[in-house]
């Protein structure tokens, strides 16, 4: 059975303000412009993610002692306190930097993640190995794969790298692949997974993917039929700057209090 996972961003309130603009968002979350460290916000998000039928969450991570790192600990602890079955893993963002980290830097980060989080009951594991999703950039290629496999020899995480041209031809392969390109409504990376997005409207720009609830319903139904994949991925729960959230916003409120996009996920579970 495929794991239904959603990308999550624990970087607020910092990122409500960007490039001198507040709020740096086109939509209005029903919780307001919240603080990601607020336990009540985290509890509400956990309930919403559970309502959407998700098995786990891929949480943006920007390095040791970053806001996202400190909030990740809060996410794990609050999940346990709520007796939630949700599992969390890290989305390693620095691989997308103009100058990505080298193998030694990655190895150090993986050692930290393993020591700090991997044994937590709410951290995601596959085949008894802690899961790490890795972002990428236009420079990602064969050398990136080689670097990550070298860097992970000691810690042995379950690595899910971001795709690039001819990624299947790499002589060395990670455990799985994913795509993160939320301006596309559906991306098929079988047999690893399928990624769907509700829309993409970056603040200050024209929409690159206009929201269409009927199209979202069709894509969620299609996803539900693909149970033999490794992952069903959704971009995103709350990346407001790029206009990809599925969390409840004033623009799509519903009687469930969860919003139209989560309602569709709630009512369309994977077919076994």
Over which residues does each language-model region extend?
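Glycan-processing catalytic domains of CAZymes
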Residues: 1-272
